[in-house]
Amino acid sequence: EEPGHFAARHLLGVVYLERGEYLVMIAGCHDCHTPNFLVNGGKGVEADYLTGGKLGWRGPWGTTYPANLRLYFQKMSEDQWVGVAKEIQRRPPMPFFSLNAMSEGDVRAIYKYIRWLGPAGVAAPSFVPPDKEPPQPYVQFPVQ
């Protein structure tokens, strides 16, 4: 392989990583999926980025918890993620409709960035049905 080809491939990888990092930030992924990101004014510890958390989001649907994306992404290929991102539907407050609307290039960039971060943390707590009391802490959404 010619040196220029290697450099071009490396640069393309860096561009994808930077794009993925940017998209994760502006799409608000850290807000729920990075522990304490919201309460720390949009600041987090990179070692904890996208590792989910134990803060529940409770509403008429039950109580949901932000998934550990760094573990989740280890279970699928990039092409599988592209398919999931276009079709996924989740309980609130996950804005799955925003993910569904992203371009394939953006979805791939997010995948590359999260895979680059590597596996870390533990799985999120399981969903709690609406008729069960979840453990603290949780954010209570108003009942409509």
Question: Predicted regions: what is each one?
Answer:
Residues E1, R9, I26, T34-T64, ...:
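Flexible coil segments in periplasmic/lumen-exposed cytochrome c-class electron-transfer proteins
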Residues E21-A27:
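Local sequence-structure signature of Cys/Sec-based thiol-disulfide redox active-site neighborhoods
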Residues D31:
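Short, cysteine/histidine-rich loop/knuckle motifs that typically chelate Zn2+
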Residues R70-Q74, G83-I88, F96-L99, W116:
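A structural feature that tracks compact, well-ordered secondary-structure segments
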Residues L17, E21, P66, R70, ...:
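Extracytoplasmic/secreted envelope proteins and their assembly/folding machinery
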Residues R19, G59, P66, V84, ...:
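Homeobox/homeodomain signature
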Residues L11-V15:
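Short Cys/His-rich Zn2+-coordinating modules
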